[in-house]
Each structure stands twice: as C-alpha cells, then as structure tokens.
Amino acid sequence: MNAIVEQLKSTAAATKATDLRAAFAADSERFSRFSVSLDDLLMDFSKTAVNDDILKLLVKLAEEGGVEKKREEMFSGKVINFTEDRAVLHTALRNRSNTPVLVDGKDVMPDVNAVLAAMGKFADGVRSGALKGATGKAITDVINIGIGGSDLGPVMATLALAPFHDGPRAHFVSNIDGAHIADILKLVQPETTLFIVASKTFTTVETMTNAQTARNFIAKALGEAAVQHHFAAVSTALDKVAAFGIDSARVFGFWDWVGGRYSIWSAIGLPLMIAIGPENFGKFLDGAHAVDNHFRQAPITENLPMLLGLIGFYHRNVLEYPTRAILPYDQRLSRFPAYLQQLDMESNGKGVTINGTPVEGNSGPVVWGEPGTNGQHAFYQLIHQGTSIIPAEFMIAANAFEPELRHQHQLLISNVLAQSEALMKGRSFAEAKKQLTDKGMDDKKADFIAPHRVFTGNRPSITFVYDKLTPYALGRLIALYEHRVFVEGVLFRINSFDQWGVELGKELATGLLPVVEGKESAAGHDSSTQGLVAALSKLAK
C-alpha cells in the first residue's frame, strides 16, 4: 500500500499542474468516463484531477489496502472497533432484507425490528392524538433533548424532510447553555408538549441538565404526576430512566454496536419518525439500505462510496489539501455540513494507527460548509482565489417541492453549475484584461486591474445530482457519506469508530465545576486557567 501511495505522490506535481480546461477540451468523453450513478443519484468527479492512471492506482490502493476485506468484517459483525471491543453495525438498523446479522453468535435483527415496531406504534399514537398529555390534550410539539449524535442527525434530517412533516412540530435542544432550552420553552405550552430525552447512559451532562430543566417545566405547570405523560426516552439505562419518572413503555433502546454519529437509523431517529411518520421513516431506511447493497456489490470503478473515499484520500494524503467544503444547494440541507462535520472529523480525526503508532502523513480533513447560494456571498471568494486549494462537494436536486417557484429553482441550478464550472475553468489574465478593455478601460489601467480578476481554475469539485430530496434520497445520501468515511479510515489505517478525543475535556470540565462554583480553589490549575476563572468570577453577578 505504501508503494502505491508513493506512486500517487510522484504524480502529484503533474496533477497540480493539470489544466482541467485543456483536459475537457481534449476529451469529449471526460464527463461520462469520470462520473458514476446509482439509480437517479449521479456523482460527477470529472472536475477533479483524477485521470485514467490515477484511477487505476486508486483502485489498486483500495485492493491492497484491504478496504473490501474490512468492509465485509464490518457488515458481518466482526469487532472492528477494537479500542472499545465493539462491532460496528449501524447498517443492521436499515437491513431491510432481514438477512441475519450475527453479533457474538446471536442474530440482532429480531431486536432491531422489535424496537422499530415499538417506535412506530408510539409515533403513530403521538401523531394521531391517541397518546395525550396529562390534561387530555393532544401533543402539538415534540422537543428532542440530546447532544452530538443524539442531536445532529435528528436535527439535520427533520429539517431536510420538512415537506413530509404531517405530525407535531419538532424542536431540538442540545447546548448546556441555558439560553437554548429557555428560548425553545417560550414557543410551547406544557400541556401539549412531549420531551424525548436521548442519552444511552442517561448520564450525559448536557442532556441530563436540560432534561431536568424540562422536567421542572412540566412539574411546575402540571404537577409531578404529569411527568410520565410528557416524557419518553431513548436509552439503555432503564433504572435511571425510571428514577427520572419515565414509564418503561416509553423507553426505546439501542445497542453498543451503534455509534452516536451513526445512530439516526436507530431509536435516536424517533423525533424524525414522529415528524414524517413511520412509513416515510421506512423509506429513509430503504434509501440507506440501497447504498449498503451498492457498496458491498458494485465494482470499485462503479462504486460511489469507494470512489468518493478514494478521491478524498487522494486529496488529503497525496495532494495534501487540508479541508473539504460541503455545499448543498438546498436550504433544507442547511445542517448537512454540520452533520458531516461530526461524522467525518469525529471518525477520522485521529493521530494514531490501528497498530498504536503515529499516523504517517495526514488523517481526516477539516470538513465545513454552508448551503448555496448563501455561501457564495460569504466564503466562496477564498475557494476561488485564495492560496489554499479547497475541494468542493456540491449537491443539487433536479426537482423542488414548490412547483409555483420553479424559476427560483432554475436559478439555484444555474448557480451551482456555474460555481463548479468556474472553479474548473478559472479566468486567465488575457480574458480578464479583455473584459475590462471591452468596457472601455484604457490598456494601462486594465493591466493593473486585471490580475485582481484572474481565477487560476483547476480547483477540484465533485457534484451530486438527484431527482428530489425525499426520505429515500436523504437516506441514500447519508449512507454514501458514512461509507466514504469508512473507506478513508481504512486507508488512513485508523479506527474510525471510537472518539477518545472527546473525553479529556469532559473530564477536566467535571473537575473545574467546583472551582467555577467557588467551592474549590483554582490553585492546582495553570496560570491561564486561574486567570480566566478570576476574570469570570469578578464579572459574575
């Protein structure tokens, strides 16, 4: 594998000098040769510097890097998250074929289907009004309380599928900052509000602090006995849930082989199911399952997650591009970049290999983005003319849900196509100067101004095109990126499924709380922390 990486690196200088405009001019088939599809989902990577030779090397890299072998280990329930001694089976949650999936010799599918059925029954009860609040009124608002994977996925997907909402209004609280829950509680009435507390252990500080605030909100307005009518939980800590006052019939579990950032397919998706209904939630799972099958069965050169991961590895570890921009041209996907940020950076932001040695080269990139066209008026300047090359990944649906606003969607499409073309083509000095002189600027001034209007071009982008942002399409898109992260993680030779980097700060925060409360001295901490504690204490009222 290292030899192939070195071969790829030897092509890097030539690749960086590649004139994509010339490549398209010389090859009328470039688009068809460097794009792949899964049903209506098209992935165009022709505007990257990948050519036939590089693609062959990347395929060889996947083969010799053991990606296919590791893929089958994941799907078959092997313990690939070895630092936590866990299988990695979020794919079982959307296994619509019901083919047995074994963990320690036991088929997990009966339990998966039982939880899914219980979720559906509960969601239908809330949606229909059969499950009422303590005063007999139907639930009109559902507030999900969680953080990280218990929040980002449901928030993103619920917003993305807004056209399919026909249930109660959905709200989300994550931040321990009291302003977050305070602002949400102003929008609802206690007698018609249901809270879902999502915490596997029921000990997550942010979640349980907000849950206690929510409990006080209900108890103060409706009495202690009302709590059981206004809460549900997604957790495996039944004793703690019962102590909180939540009926066991309203508790939905999941398993230690489901990582938080991969948990939207599990009971963590309950607020989404309540919003869009069990049938549409099933279609969401169907879309992901279709990608799972494609990932396992399609040859590498036709395999969307494989190719996306290979190109991502090439950009990060060969061309050494430090970031990637996620740019969905769909306002309802406005939280998708943040969702992928956690998925990618928490998975592949590692500095140690599976052998316990330092990573050679780079691991995962910084992932960020905003929906188009908003980003065009914010940070695209740097993507087009900055000194760093930032690979861009565009997403656009051919059809929107507002036929009366068709012209606006056509404007959206024209913008995303223009951005990918502009990044590829750029604008030369001669073209910039001619544009100025054609407008009447004299030659000398045009020579001075033109450099500021030059675009180097050759800036890589991938574009995804699909029919419409349905539950099926969203499930497919999420699973595509999940498997992309997996492919890159295997090639980085890291464990993509733990997150020890989250722990140290949490441990230190626990120790600092008594200091902030004034119960202990800050003397044992560094001078900066002592100074900050003193400054905050002085300002506190």
Curated annotation (Swiss-Prot):
It comes from the Bacteria. The keyword Repeat does not apply. Its main location: cytoplasm. Pathway: Carbohydrate biosynthesis; gluconeogenesis; Carbohydrate degradation; glycolysis; D-glyceraldehyde 3-phosphate and glycerone phosphate from D-glucose: step 2/4. PROSITE patterns: P_GLUCOSE_ISOMERASE_1 (PS00765), P_GLUCOSE_ISOMERASE_2 (PS00174), P_GLUCOSE_ISOMERASE_3 (PS51463). The keyword Cytoplasm applies. One of its GO terms (molecular function) is carbohydrate derivative binding. Coiled coil: none annotated. The active site is at residues 346, 377, 506. It is found in: Cytoplasm. It catalyses: alpha-D-glucose 6-phosphate = beta-D-fructose 6-phosphate. GO terms for biological process: gluconeogenesis; glucose 6-phosphate metabolic process; glycolytic process. Its EC number is 5.3.1.9. Signal peptide: none annotated. Pfam families: PGI. Gene3D superfamilies: 1.10.1390.10, Glucose-6-phosphate isomerase like protein, domain 1. Keywords: Cytoplasm, Gluconeogenesis, Glycolysis, Isomerase. One of its GO terms (cellular component) is cytosol. NCBIfam families: PRK00179.1 (NF001211). HAMAP family: G6P_isomerase (MF_00473). PANTHER family: GLUCOSE-6-PHOSPHATE ISOMERASE. Belongs to the GPI family. Catalyzes the reversible isomerization of glucose-6-phosphate to fructose-6-phosphate. This is Glucose-6-phosphate isomerase. It comes from Rhizobium leguminosarum bv. trifolii (strain WSM2304).
